[in-house]
């Protein structure tokens, strides 16, 4: 009798303690949940690519420290997304091993981005030359990643009405813009053309094709990003 009563009490306590998490998750739409899980892995993709390219080119020039510096920032972005997943009781899709992804598209994309081939078949309109073809190609890979992140983050912002989620996304967007500025500076602002921000395949209602590169890069003196 005592054992049965104990089990009942324990079950009630478990349900009571768990209810807030399930309630928070239930408050999100399926698309919001999908955005959160995708964004967590997309930030991991950026982090893992930059770490891999830094290790590959390490010692090749001082400009390559950009990959290590931005990888550190991407880790903060990953942590911020993990915080949102935990807040809403959503399972974390990110594997701890570098270069391993639950999302099959991101897995294939990672392979292209860090390859030494000049003839990759694009997965998401990325450059056909992988980041290990040369330093310039690696910089273009970095810039492409940040452009891709910006598009996906803007889509995710338009897809939620929750202030906490939108706030994290806005910080991520600020960070991606800062990272894009850094890569464009290495490539030469006068020589760089956006790779997908103006692409008709990627432009949505929140992205206007006539907007300039300067618009996307923003003014770094006005921004403090995580």
Q: What residues fall within each predicted segment?
A:
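Sec/Tat signal peptide C-region and signal peptidase I cleavage site
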Residues: 17-23
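Bacterial N-terminal signal peptides
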Residues: 9-16
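Bacterial N-terminal signal peptides that target proteins for export
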Residues: 1-7
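Short hydrophobic transmembrane-like helices used for membrane targeting/insertion
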Residues: 7-8, 21
